[in-house]
């Protein structure tokens, strides 16, 4: 705590109040779901801390929140702690605060508008045309990396070029940038539309803040993606996570939806012009 000032703690609290007010004004319901879960979503390179007596600390409340959508909730948000093993640095901490929000019967374009409006609220001095530049993933790779991931998929090259070429180029653009429409191989939990996944990530001055999907609600396709992710984790000698079949079985009840995960600590960092996560929250 020694790196955090009282003024910063007060400003962080004001930002959290502003976030809640923003969603309350739009008739969202704030929800709470379990922090200790039995079955995380299997994703390569995202490791949830295991608990001694079984289960895991969540990396995201995503699966649990989607179950609420399946029950009939329409607009929900949650602010709370999340955990990822092995992530520590100026922008990372094993424990961090996340906000996720979801809308039934909407797609990623509506969440993009939410994100733009929220940033306008949190960054009131930012020029409007600096809040929401849209960059297509395919065009970004063609221009800044010199190849097309759709023509010849290479996961390692895609990830390497994202970190060394695409994100530095986004930083040079300044302000808010939506990097949108990913290859299907990088769809994660996003719905496909033709040869693209309806997914975007939002950056502010080059720092990734948020990751959004039009949600995949096809039971069999999602089960297949989870099985493929489990196989990839096994090949990398990473921990195996059981599949949450309650989540899988709930997907047809959702119909259609979109949602986003936004890192609160990073949002506070950019709002207060801090360059170290330790300046805005307690860290290990």
Locations of the language-model features?
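A short, surface-exposed helix-loop junction/capping segment
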Residues: 1-7, 144-145
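Auxiliary tRNA-acceptor-end handling modules of aminoacyl-tRNA synthetases
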Residues: 8-9, 23
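Aromatic- and glycine-enriched glycan-recognition loops and surfaces
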Residues: 11-15
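Hydrophobic face of alpha-helices
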Residues: 16, 20, 24, 112-119, ...
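A translation/RNA-centric and nucleic-acid-associated enzymatic feature enriched
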Residues: 18-21, 34-71, 75-104, 145-284
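Short beta-strand elements
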Residues: 30-32
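A conserved active-site cap/scaffold subdomain adjacent to cofactor or substrate pockets
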Residues: 91-153
């Amino acid at each position: 705590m020694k790196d955090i000032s009282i003024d910063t703690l007060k400003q962080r609290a004001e930002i959290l109040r502003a976030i809640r007010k923003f969603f309350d004004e739009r008739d969202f319901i704030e929800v709470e779901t379990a922090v200790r879960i039995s079955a995380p979503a299997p994703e390569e390179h995202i490791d949830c801390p295991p608990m001694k007596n079984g289960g895991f600390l969540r990396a995201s409340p995503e699966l649990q929140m989607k179950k609420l959508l399946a029950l009939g909730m329409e607009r929900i948000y949650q602010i709370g702690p999340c955990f990822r093993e092995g992530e520590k640095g100026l922008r990372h901490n094993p424990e961090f605060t996340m906000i996720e929000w979801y809308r039934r019967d909407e797609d990623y374009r509506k969440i993009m508008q939410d994100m733009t409006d929220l940033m306008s609220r949190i960054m009131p001095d930012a020029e409007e045309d600096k809040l929401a530049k849209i960059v297509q993933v395919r065009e970004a790779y063609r221009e800044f990396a010199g190849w097309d991931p759709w023509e010849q998929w290479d996961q390692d090259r895609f990830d390497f070029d994202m970190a060394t070429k695409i994100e530095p180029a986004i930083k040079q653009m300044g302000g808010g940038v939506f990097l949108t429409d990913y290859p299907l191989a990088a769809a994660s939990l996003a719905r496909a539309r033709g040869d693209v996944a309806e997914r975007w990530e939002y950056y502010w001055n080059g720092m990734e803040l948020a990751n959004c999907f039009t949600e995949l609600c096809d039971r069999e396709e999602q089960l297949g993606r989870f099985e493929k992710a489990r196989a990839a984790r096994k090949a990398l000698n990473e921990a195996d996570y059981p599949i949450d079949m309650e989540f899988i079985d709930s997907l047809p009840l959702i119909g259609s939806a979109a949602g986003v995960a936004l890192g609160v600590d990073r949002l506070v960092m950019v709002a207060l012009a801090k360059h170290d996560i330790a300046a805005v929250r307690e860290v290990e």
